[in-house]
Amino acid sequence: MHRIIIPTTLLSLTLLSPQISSAQDFTVVKQNPITSVKDQNESGTCWDYATLGFVESEILRTTGKTYDLCEMFVVNKDYMDCAIHHVRMHGFSQIAEGGSADDVFEVIKKYGICPEEAMPAPGSLVGDSLANFNEFRKVLKPAVQYFGTGTNHTYPADALGVSSKNFKTIPGWQDSVQTIIDRYVGKCPEKFVYEGKTYTPKTFAESLGIDWNNYISLTSFTHHPFYEDFVIEAMHKWRLRPSFNLPIDRLMSILDNAINAGYCVAWGGDVSGNFWANGEAYLPNSKLPVTQEIRQQQWDDWTFTYDHVMLIYGIAKKANGKKYYMVKNSWGTQYGHKGIWYMSEDFIKLNTTYLFLCKDAVKKKMLKP
């Protein structure tokens, strides 16, 4: 989830890349409108930037209007929700920067959203020009644990052999944690003016013309039955929102159909390997097809994990005829092809944790055996 962590690995992999491709090496087959590439900088908020980019592309698709929505509004609300959940679970849940596409939609449905200009610019409150959580990440979790449980234990009390009944939450702890979050990412506005009109975050979300309940998360694993919902067992899925389980070939068909029908898709998956800084992701020297069994094996042995979220917005082909997907990242324009990656079909097939997209992009028959 961290740009600061993943690119460190990514940059070392760059030296191992067999060849450097340029954008001219790819022929666009289908390309859907997106907004500009953003930079999450030193913050573990890929899930936020990618999903708001997805929302912006949905607004473009449905209204033709361009918006720059505020990532730090979502961070503020989501981190507070996460802190409350962490305390209610007596520490037996994550409190970290990572998240998923579900989080963004849950925040918007509950609290609304605002444009970028309605809050302090990312990083400005800590003397940076972009989001910088280097200090924030060191402060937030200990603060939640101290104010929420009255202890500075870094692990759940019961895990230390001490009953959580020995600890009590400190009265007003939520206000204390909220003050810290506001200090680092900015306080969310109650009202703001946008293009001459006054909005609350809720009325602004309503004005965007999006049905926030008309979206679905799809996945593909064999440790749960196909054609049923289940919660993906990943640490950043703390809201426990379900995904609908499908065979991988069916999932790939849905992705293709959606892109070709003019929809963008939020993608959650693994970029810890074979994801080159020059803007290409593929499985080198891969002669065997990616199967459902290989995916499951790599998920089970932790070769394949959930560590990044991006936006798929198009399909392209390389000169050798190999199929790629066009992907908008959130690491600024200094990486990839000015912030765009080309991910091969087999890479996507192996490394996809979930797809998040509009229900209208999915034919109902595709969700049935």
Regions found by a protein language model. Name each.
Residues 41-55, 95-102, 173, 308:
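Active-site nucleophilic cysteine motif
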Residues 33-58, 62, 77:
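Cross-family signature of deubiquitinases and ubiquitin-like deconjugating cysteine proteases
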Residues 1-24:
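Bacterial Sec-dependent N-terminal signal peptides
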Residues 35, 162-171, 175-369:
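Active-site signature of cysteine proteases
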Residues 24-32:
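N-terminal regions that are enriched for targeting/export leaders
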Residues 71-195:
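Papain-like cysteine protease catalytic cores
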Residues 45-48, 72-76, 104-107, 115-118, ...:
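Structural recognition of the beta-strand scaffold that forms the well-ordered cores
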Residues 51-60, 109-113, 260, 317:
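Sec-exported extracytoplasmic/periplasmic mature domains
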